[in-house]
């Protein structure tokens, strides 16, 4: 249910309501392309914070055996910052940026430790399907609350004449915080903390010292995880494009004149269409392999980025949104499960921390490039088409990954560990 709960942040805050609110209300005192650029820079900075912290905290969580506690801590930061978005009003773009930075830090940070639980609750044969079903649940849960929020925003003033025009949007931010918190509770009640496993010479040592030593050792021995590292580089490249499309599509559409109803309606459609396609990609991976399934999604994303350059009508946005829905969940779920198969289970939080570094630096580079091109050119059409370079390079590097060899390397590392209470 954590996918169901936290995905409300991804839909209402990251993708749909807040970007439009940032452009139309919080950033209404700025030029449209300036508001777009500052949203991109805000997204980049929040991702940078997580990228710096995630590997260290992941290593500490592995050593101490408390992944759930770290998950809860970051969730608390995210829920609190999201609730405080209620106080953002006209011209408050700086406050909106600060709260979004903390909200996204909490959201992304919690996912490091949530993802680290995946190899412990699913077998190697099940991990693609479990990850895909989790993403499907996320799309449905996030989409359901987004639908409720859209109804609130569209009909709130009609039902309650004379209210502040921004009130329903601000209440939607509060609803995300409540939804996220409530649907996180089953995880903390029913999922057990994984067994703590450490190296023989680490027992009784200082957690911070051990964690830094582990990180240093991992960097030194990264050649031993050649396929895992190669995949992380590939992921970094193609995730630049995917993440930027997710976070910048709505504000891009707003800039080129697509109506708010179309923007939010399309994103709502994406949530429900993406759910069955995420499950379908899990099944496809079982038939043709995880790597080939990711290839397919990246080819489609390349076509989407090209199509985005020519976007001018509302139906174009709907069509591109449907194409995104076909591949968004599958590409993310299979990437998450593939790294889970090629990492040592005893160091899952540490390696998902590294995964988060590559993911967050992709969230830095992509939106930053988008904002930079938009600033230099005065509009954002070239920004969207420039994303194809990330997909093409990602596919080239992905072709160098030997999945079976990577899985065997992870198993050999786990065999060196001892179990402690």
Where are the language model's segments positioned?
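Multi-pass alpha-helical transporter architecture, strongest
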Residues: 87, 179-190, 385-420
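Helix-to-loop junctions at the C-terminal end of transmembrane segments
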Residues: 52-66, 276-290, 374
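Hydrophobic core of transmembrane alpha-helices in multi-pass small-molecule transporters
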Residues: 81, 92-110, 316-330
């Amino acid at each position: 249910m954590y996918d169901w709960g936290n995905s409300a942040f991804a839909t209402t805050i990251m993708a749909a309501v807040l970007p439009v609110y940032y452009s139309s209300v919080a950033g209404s005192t700025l030029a449209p392309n300036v508001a777009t650029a500052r949203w991109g820079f805000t997204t980049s900075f929040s991702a940078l914070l997580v990228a710096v912290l995630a590997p260290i905290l992941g290593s500490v969580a592995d050593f101490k055996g408390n992944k759930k506690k770290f998950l809860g801590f970051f969730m608390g930061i995210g829920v609190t910052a999201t609730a405080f978005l209620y106080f953002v009003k006209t011209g408050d773009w700086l406050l909106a940026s600060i709260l979004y930075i903390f909200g996204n830090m909490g959201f992304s940070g919690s996912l490091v430790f949530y993802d680290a639980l995946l190899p412990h609750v699913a077998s190697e044969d099940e991990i693609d399907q479990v990850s895909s079903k989790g993403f499907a649940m996320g799309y449905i849960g996030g989409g359901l609350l987004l639908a409720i929020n859209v109804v609130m925003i569209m009909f709130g003033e009609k039902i309650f004449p004379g209210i502040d025009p921004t009130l329903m949007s601000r209440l939607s931010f509060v609803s995300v915080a409540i939804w996220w918190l409530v649907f996180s509770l089953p995880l903390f009640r029913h999922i057990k903390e994984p067994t703590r496993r450490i190296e023989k010479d680490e027992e009784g040592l200082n957690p911070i010292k051990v964690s830094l030593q582990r990180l240093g050792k991992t960097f030194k021995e990264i050649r031993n995880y050649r396929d895992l590292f190669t995949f992380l580089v590939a992921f970094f490249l193609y995730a630049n494009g995917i993440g930027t499309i997710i976070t910048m599509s709505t504000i891009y559409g707003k800039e080129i004149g697509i109506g708010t109803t179309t923007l939010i309606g399309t994103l709502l459609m994406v949530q429900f269409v993406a759910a069955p396609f995420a499950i379908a990609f899990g099944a496809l991976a079982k038939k043709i392999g995880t790597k080939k399934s990711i290839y397919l999604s990246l080819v489609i994303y390349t076509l989407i980025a090209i199509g985005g350059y020519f976007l001018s009508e509302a139906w174009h946005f709907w069509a591109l949104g449907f194409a995104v829905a076909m591949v968004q969940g599958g590409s993310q779920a299979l990437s998450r499960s593939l790294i889970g198969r090629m990492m040592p289970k005893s160091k899952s939080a540490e390696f998902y921390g590294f995964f988060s570094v590559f993911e967050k630096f992709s969230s830095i580079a992509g939106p930053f490039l988008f904002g930079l091109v938009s600033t230099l050119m005065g509009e954002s059409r070239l920004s969207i088409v420039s994303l194809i370079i990330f997909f093409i390079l990602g596919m080239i590097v992905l072709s160098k990954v030997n999945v079976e060899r990577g899985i065997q390397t992870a198993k050999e590392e786990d065999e060196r560990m001892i179990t402690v209470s």
